[in-house]
């Protein structure tokens, strides 16, 4: 196993960004990471693209990374899409690390890109339901409602402040 080094990082500011899409958010973060690493797109051997919710928000499925990265000029290299709920970005990073440590690539890029906020906040929150066992979701809702009441809350987190 070879030693692996993180040679560059990049990120976008946190925000709602109603006017932006996953492509533009990913491009901003990737540009910063490549500049930080002093690496060009042509130096990449592979990309691990982590995204969990784009299919629910925009309908883009199966080739999320290929679509986002092609718009940025990255193509004709292996692009692996990964989804692992809240650990999606960490999973992309782990897979990139494995690729380099195992000698399969010299330069691997890990990307975690999400566009979660949408104007329809009811739909936005419903999107999270699919991250649970759909066969028992009603039982889970009842259980959580009872637990919330035990701690002085209201059903659905009624006294939780909203930031949007």
Predicted features along the sequence, with ranges:
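Extended interaction regions within the primary functional domain
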Residues: 155
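Pocket-edge structural micro-motifs
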Residues: 8-9, 51
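Short, intrinsically disordered, charge-balanced linker/junction segments flanking boundaries
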Residues: 158-164
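Phosphate/pyrophosphate-binding loops at sites that engage ATP/ADP/AMP, CoA/4′-phosphopantetheine
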Residues: 31-45
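N-terminal phosphate-binding or glycine-rich loops at protein starts, especially the Walker A/P-loop
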Residues: 10-33
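Conserved catalytic cysteine-centered active-site region
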Residues: 2-5, 14-17, 54-107, 111, ...
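Metallocofactor- and cofactor-centric catalytic cores in central/energy metabolism, strongly enriched
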Residues: 2, 20, 24-27, 43-49, ...
């Amino acid at each position: 196993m070879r030693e692996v080094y993180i040679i560059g990082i990049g990120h976008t500011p946190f925000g709602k960004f109603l006017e932006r899409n996953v492509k533009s958010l990913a491009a901003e973060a990737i540009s910063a990471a490549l500049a930080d690493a002093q690496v060009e797109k042509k130096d990449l051997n592979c990309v691990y693209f982590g995204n969990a919710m784009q299919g629910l928000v925009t309908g883009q499925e199966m080739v999320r990374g290929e679509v986002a990265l092609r718009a940025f000029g990255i193509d004709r290299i292996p692009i692996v899409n990964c989804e692992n709920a809240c650990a999606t970005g960490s999973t992309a990073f782990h897979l990139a690390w494995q690729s380099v440590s195992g000698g399969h690539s010299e330069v691997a890029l890990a990307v975690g890109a999400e566009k979660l906020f949408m104007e329809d906040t009811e739909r936005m929150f419903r999107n999270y339901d699919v991250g649970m066992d759909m066969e028992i979701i009603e039982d889970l809702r009842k259980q959580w409602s009872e637990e919330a009441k035990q701690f002085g809350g209201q059903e659905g987190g009624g006294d939780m402040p909203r930031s949007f």
